[in-house]
């Protein structure tokens, strides 16, 4: 069994610490960082989850590094703020016509609408494989109807 994941990826950074007082200059919490974790996010998270199940998986994703850094109060696990860097647009995917789709038992499209995949790309992928799962932030349209499953997301 081999699965292909295609879509936008990011690096998810979590900085855990404490925020026990307000800043004297402005009514904002003073955050004291204690530990940091990093994981793959978006399509990279899908890839890591599938890989953790022992399933062979390939990932086609953006080259640009999009980072989402969350500052989390460690006692309550509440996010205080999220800081995004380079999160506007990804370079569009290239080479979809060169992928050996028949080598995969399924294709997962993880589209966060950052520009890596356009509607025509999704339609093309759906035309090349019988088992396509779509998780998208785009408005679902007729170009996606070739997919087996579609998960709809709210706008972030």
Protein language model annotation of sequence segments:
Residues 31:
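Central beta-strand plus flanking loop segment that forms part of the substrate or channel wall
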Residues 1-22, 26, 34-156:
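Ribokinase/PfkB-type carbohydrate-kinase core domain
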């Amino acid at each position: 069994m081999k699965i292909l994941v295609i879509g936008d990826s990011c690096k998810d950074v979590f900085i855990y610490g404490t925020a026990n007082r307000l800043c004297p200059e402005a009514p904002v919490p003073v955050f004291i960082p204690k530990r940091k974790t990093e994981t793959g996010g978006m399509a990279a998270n899908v890839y890591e989850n599938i890989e953790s199940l022992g399933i062979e998986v390939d990932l086609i994703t953006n080259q640009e590094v999009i980072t989402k850094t969350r500052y989390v109060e460690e006692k309550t696990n509440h996010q205080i703020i999220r800081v995004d860097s380079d999160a506007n647009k990804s370079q569009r995917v290239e080479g979809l016509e060169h992928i050996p789709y028949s080598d995969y038992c399924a294709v997962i499209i993880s589209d966060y609408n950052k520009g890596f995949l356009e509607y025509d790309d999704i339609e093309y992928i759906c035309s090349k494989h019988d088992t396509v799962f779509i998780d998208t932030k785009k408005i679902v349209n007729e170009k996606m109807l070739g997919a087996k499953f579609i998960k709809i997301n709210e706008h972030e």
